[in-house]
Amino acid sequence: MGVAQAAPAHEKGELDCHPVGEVGIIATQSYWTNHYYGHQHYDFKESRLEPTEERKGKPKKKLQFYECKPPTSKLNGTTAQHWFGQLRVADEPTKCVTTTTWWVKTKDTGAYGGPGYTSRPEGKKTETTLKECSTSEETLRLQWFGMTRPSKKNVNAALVHKGYAEDEEAFAICGNEENTDEGKGSYFCRASDM
């Protein structure tokens, strides 16, 4: 006689997720000497994250954060301050914001004396795109985000790409320098000394 055990939800192609917070867009603010300035809105053009042509342009793709129970201990779970899960297209909830890399701290010093960071896998072009939402552990690493729980009304939530619990948070948006046929593109990054 044996005990029948069900496969974990993510192995059956399911994640336990539900929408939290408001539908919104990806936007950044620059911060310098105690002042915020320079809002920049982002949209997905042909599934690639790019800045809108006008800094405060109206993105076509609205996004919804989905809090998900982590199907593996490699991923962070929700805390009192942060939700963790997937960032999905509001009107296409099978499409998820997906990075091509994750960030790790290096032994090197950053440009301004703080810690240095690099993306992995080494040599992979860093991009943020829209892909089918996944339940595979490897792809979840590229689709696992954290979002702050706003403590006040009308306060925007902060968004980070988290990946595995051991990975560094990518809390900034950087632009690819090289021009390609598809455009420059933008991605979640971990900038030194920010």
Regions found by a protein language model. Give the residues of each.
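Secretory targeting and sorting signals
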Residues: 1-7
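Extracellular glycan-recognition/adhesion modules and their associated mucin-like linkers
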Residues: 7-107, 118-124, 131-194
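Intrinsically disordered, low-complexity Ser/Thr- and acidic-rich flexible linkers and loops
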Residues: 111-115
